[in-house]
Each structure stands twice: as structure tokens, then as C-alpha cells.
Amino acid sequence: MMPQQDDFLQQLYSRRGGIKLGLGRVADAFPVIFEKNIPVYHVAGTNGKGTAVYSLDHILRSNGLKTGRFVSPHLLRYNERISVDGADIADGEVREIYDYLEKKIGNFEELSFFEITFLIAWKYFEISGCDRAVFEVGLGGRLDATNVIGGPKTDIITSIGLDHTHILGDTLEKIALEKLGIVKKDDLVLIGGSADPAFDKWMAEVALSKGAQSVDDDSLDLEIAFPPSCMSPEQRKNVRLAVKAALMSEEKGLKIPDFSGMKIPARFEFIEPDIVTDVAHNPPAIGSLAKTVKERLGKVVVLYGAMKDKDVTKVLDLIGEITDSIYVVNLEADNDRGAKVWDILDRAGSKVSNKIKYAETDEKTMEEALAFARQNGKKLLVTGSFHTVEKFMSYKKYS
């Protein structure tokens, strides 16, 4: 009898055990299961990857192409990570491909959670007959499991910022080199512009030195239909990157679709008229989010949780500009990398320490945050991590 899906997923989750960068294991496994070449869009960057991936998927499907989409992490269900034509992979298909991989791959037991998930995605896209596949890099690029995909392909580097510095390096240049590690010979490369033209020029030179066929930026003189109030300026930039990438890569005649119906989970997403979710988790992303909130919503109430390795002090200072009330939840119970409430309190600067609130349980904290926001006629912003949004959505029983 096939084990229940929850039991099976627990087996898969048990392989998490922290980040395991390195291509050796998955580079041995990938050729064993590879059967069909699929034209690939490969998306790396500190922030904005999700928006670019969902936008590319939307553009390609709107032009009649069958697409595979690979993202991470998921919010509520593992299946969200892998989809074909916008529909998540079914439980039975996950298990069927997992069993196939286990029998086929000699070093299967050495593979990490992310590596197995990537291999499941690739095989599912092959089986489904996808015309295109859009892959989001998990972390960095050079040593990410997705980097076993060969070229030529189309690469997007959305942005470069200081995040995961203990793994990727402590300067923008070091981090950029990790992201640019996805570039292969004859790839088309698109780089999201920064505030420093000299830095952008250096990145383009690095990409060309790796054999890129061409390197371009996100400038685009085309009218794109954006929802008037939903997308932030940063999201619009990443949509433009996706449009430019598709125009560079596809046949002439590609139509730019209307983006008003496109849903990007937890990227300035209103899950109720007075509740906004956003997975911003580092200073550049929170800074961009805070700017959008100021312009669109004014003062809000914030529900916040974080991972231990984030720059909590700087993030809280930025959040403090848009709120007088920061309700904090404990993420350690959900993830061994999560920060406790006390960790966040200890790292809160003098500007915001008097704004922080919490209750005896996370459920009570979330209940109080939402009630306080509604009593005062303000929006509730849920942010700081994928896990913060997941916790709140599970509490509210969204699916």
C-alpha cells in the first residue's frame, strides 16, 4: 500500500537539514533522468525572482506555450513549487516521480530536499510535454541545484543585494558573481539595473566573459497594462524584465498580455480587503515595500517574523517608518532557522523597541494584531518571511 501523502512528505522534509550547496550530487543524478531538452528561462537575484518567474509563466502561457514553473519555497503546500500551465503538480504525481527517481538514481540517498524537488520538477516537465520551463534559483546560482541545466538558455538576474552573506559573500561583487554563476555559453542574459551604472557594466562584462551571447538591461519602451493599485514599482520593474526576456528569446510576434489578472502569491497581495501579505525579508526588499506602503496605504499595523540570519535591526527600523504597532511571532517552532520573539526583541533598535507587541501564544498575537488593525481602521501587513505569511494563512485557514 502506498504511504499517505503526509507521511511521504515527512520523509522528504527530513532531508532538509540546512542548506547544502554544491553541484556534485545533483550533477551525477541529472544526466541519469534527463531525456528531453526543454528551452529554459533561469531566474536568479536577491529579490524579485518570484515576480519575474510568475510573469514569464503568464507571458508564455498567454502566447499558447505549455509551461513548467519551478519556485521555492512554498507557502502552504509542497505542490506549489512545481506547476504546469499554472496547475500545481498532483500528490500522486509527486509520489510517482519520487519512486521513479529512487529506483533510477544510484546516489539518491545523498540528495537533499531541494535537489530531489528540482529533479521531480524537471521530470514532470518532460512527462507533461512542456514547451518552455521557468526555473527560480533557490539560493545564489553558481552552486544551486538548478545550475546543472545546460545552455543555451535565457538568464535573468533581477537584483543584487546583501542577503545570505554568510554563504554568498559579504560584498555586492561577491554576491553578483554567485548569481552570474548561472550564465552558460551562448546564453541570453538580462540584468535588472541598479543605481550604479558602473556596477551594471561590470556585471555585463562578467556575463560576456562567461560566453554569453548577449547581455541587456531592463529598459523597455513599450506600454504594459498594469493593475492600477496592485503592483509596487519594484514589481513592475521585474515584470518588465520578464517581458524583455520573452521578447529577446521568442519568435517575432510575441504578444504582451494584460497583467491585471496575474496573481503573484504574497507579493503585496491583498488576501482580504484589509490584509496584505508580502514575503519581503531583507533590507532592500523591506525598503521597497515600505515605500509602496507609504504611498498606497499610509500607516499600517504589522505582523512580523524573521529568520535568525536576517538583518532584523535594519529591517525593523524600516518597518518602523510605516507603523506604530509591530506584532511579533515566533518562527523557531516552525523552522530551525526561525527567530524567537526574544531574538527579535534583543535586536530591535531604540527607534522601534517601544512599538513591538506580542502575546503568550502566536495565535493570540495574530488575533490581537488583526483585531487592533480593524478597530483602528488600518490595514494589517503580514511580512518578514515566507514562514510569517505561511503561519498567518494557516491560522486564518486559507488554502
Task: Identify the meaning behind each predicted range.
Residues S385:
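Active-site-proximal loop/hinge segments that shape catalytic or ion-binding/gating pockets
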Residues L23-K36, S62-G150, L168:
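ATP-dependent carboxylate-amine ligase catalytic core
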Residues S194-S219, L316-K379:
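C-terminal helical cap/extension that packs against the catalytic core
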Residues I127, R132-F135, D144-I156, I160-G161, ...:
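Nucleotide phosphate-binding/pyrophosphate-handling subdomain across enzymes
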Residues L56-R61, F125, I319, A348:
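Hydrophobic alpha-helical packing residues
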Residues M1-G45, A52-Y54, H58-L65, F70, ...:
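Short functional linear segments
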Residues R142-L143, G150-K210, V312:
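Conserved catalytic-core segment of NTP-binding enzymes
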